[in-house]
Amino acid sequence: VVLKQSKSPDITETVIVDLTGRSSQYYDPNTYAFDVAIGGLPFLLNVNDTTPYRRSTARWKYERVDQAREPGEQTLDSGLWVRSQTSFHLGEGVQYQEALEGNAEQLRFRYFTGQGIDPWTPGQISLLKDTSKIFPAATSSSGRVISLPATISGVDYVLHIDCAAAGSTAVRVARVAADGTATSLILGSALSTEILAAETDGTTLYLATATYIYDYDLTAASPTLHAHYQINTANATSVVLQFVKNRIMAGVSYVTGTTPVAAVYELPFAGGHGGSHTNLSTITSVANTTTVPVGWIWSDIAEGRGAIYVSGYAGDKSAIFKIAPDSTGALGAAVSVADIPRGETVRSLFGYLGTYLAIGTSRGVRVAAIADDATIVYGPLIFNTTNPILGFAARDSYIYAGVKAGIGGASGIYRIYLGQLLDDGTYPYATDIVATGTTGSVDALGFFPTSAQLFFSVHSSGTYLEHATNLVSEGTLQTAIVNWGTLEKKAWKRVRVETGTLNGNIEIYADANEGRTQITTLTTGNAYNTDFDLSGAYASTQVNGQLAFTLYRNADSASTGAIMKGYAIKAIPSPTRSRLIQLPLMCYDFESDRRNTRYGTLGGAKFRLSALETVESNGATVLVQDFTSGENFDAVIEEIAFTRMTPPSGTYENFGGIITITMRTVV
């Protein structure tokens, strides 16, 4: 019963709430039988038809307007959140589809990882070409293999060079055509020792061993191996040969007595392919190339705009030098142009178009830009590897790098696209062709000039060639993780996949916390722009969504296979819902609780309202105790409205009425 007429307080009535300051937000209900307490302030409810108790779900989703240059995923309101990809041409290497760092416009064309997939045609993914070992056909090479391109009498070949020391009947150098037809050029009877380096200038093959540098005329009717240079009186421990700026350059490391020596030489080969050999000690090395740390190994040589570049390392220290020719063609001194981060060593160099210098290191690949003055500025690692990068090739807008055991555990090629610099200073990349079942280092790679077929050599295996038409049997692409940049859980609903008429099957998988689950198979001969249910894969709400697509080659034609245009994954966020609770509270000077116990004090209503408004102003979370339902929860006061129900009476203010309080639960 509410006592709406105020009177002088009786001595038996006590102040049940200390309005001068509360020591706790918890109210002990064992004194008076109140209905609720808010932040330690107790109240009775005034629930009736006019002032009901209201409880509703707080708004948890807000309208969004897609203001991108093109209409996007949020423009169309299907009630679901959508993340789609219509192209993959900026390659792999991103874990999250949302831009935690970098450019969102670039991330929308990238994916997490792939194998056997060609993403480089905008608007689709397809299968890569297959590979086969062309030499040796029936056996495997016993060690390091160097493969070099050569065009002899108008026919393209691969020069397959087995580097390990071998017996007299072993084939050390073979000329191999694209169809696998092989001709032995040099046998072990002519050269039995280990080959340390090999290079061609288009017509002559150069080979280096620990004691000699040989030349071999590829165009002669009956060529013979000729020892042109003897490597001093001390045997070389390592040699690198490269044909750059129309000259053969050699980086040689050897030991004189107990002193390691390293030097770079320009090697004149005037006088044809016969005659006596010349001792390398009679050739003046390039200035400054001997003043390197003890134990230095020259690892590679390349050319760029206005200079020759040489790389080397000793221990965990590595550097790149430039050697610039003057107007007469004479070489100047070597000048350091790049120090590599300690612990990372340069193992290969490749100059392309006079503008780019690919740097293969013990940790991966970097690409440097070559300035007009031949200085270089290199970027971060484009991709990381656990084994050194030992060789490169290039064609059109791409650089290709050989990777040991780096594609599903097998050795093969990574392709780097130079056509677009990414915001993080790297270039797009993706895995390319692979030598299935091999794990050796990729020692060399190149292209058949006419057919543009890529070949590469694998340590302890042989030379592999990209097939002219046949595709790999299958390839898989795994998308980046989708979570819309929020850690709220989502109910993953559907995936839409678009294809043309398929020439091979496509299997769709979802990667969830429970593991990978196959969603469906798209079959040959059908075209799709279809939604598929994901509920079987995502049994519970989860933060992240991720898909994988496996494309298959046609069962009847090895030269055709599946092509996928894009996908869209759809989900609805499932955050823990907060509630809006509206309570009508009695606020009079004198009231009676649910046990009909009378309590109150003159002016108590105004004090209680003021105390509640102070709690609201503080903006803090308050404990709400509902003694009618036994529910306790934390909430934030969103609104307090007071309606006065009693007029002044005599000399008393008679302040009292109904407080309507709106609170949002905190979840």
Which positions does each model-derived feature cover?
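Loop/turn-rich, solvent-exposed surfaces of beta-rich toroidal or solenoidal domains
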Residues: T345-R366, F383-L422, E488, R494
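Extracellular/virion structural assembly segments
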Residues: I572-V667
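Beta-propeller fold detector
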Residues: T183-S189, T224-I231, G275-N288, L331-D339, ...
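N-terminal beta-propeller domains
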Residues: L3-G188, E199, T204, A208-A220, ...
